[in-house]
């Protein structure tokens, strides 16, 4: 199971999300306050992730410690 910390965050808050895994890369999609968000992992050797959690209309790439960085962004959201 990939993106375990982010999945646990959603489960603890009882927030619905979709998760799937392909080629050792996890993907999460979810809706929050009417907007659609994604977290998509990149495969080795350039392990990282792409997500729009910082700004819903713009995707950005996260490198080292991507799961921790994305999780910290999610924790700043109100009403989560």
Language-model features: locations:
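Short, conserved beta-strand/beta-arch hydrophobic-aromatic motifs that form part
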Residues: 35-53
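Negatively charged, low-complexity tracts enriched in Asp/Glu with abundant Ser/Thr
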Residues: 1-32, 52-71, 79-80
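Divalent cation-coordinating acidic motifs and surrounding scaffolds
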Residues: 75
């Amino acid at each position: 199971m990939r993106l375990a910390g982010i999945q646990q965050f959603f489960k603890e808050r009882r927030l619905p999300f979709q998760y799937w895994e392909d080629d050792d890369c996890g993907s999460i999609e979810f809706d929050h306050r009417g907007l659609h968000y994604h977290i998509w992992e990149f495969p080795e050797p350039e392990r990282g992730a792409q997500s729009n959690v910082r700004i819903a209309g713009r995707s950005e790439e996260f490198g080292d410690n991507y799961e921790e960085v994305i999780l910290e962004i999610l924790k700043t959201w109100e009403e989560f």
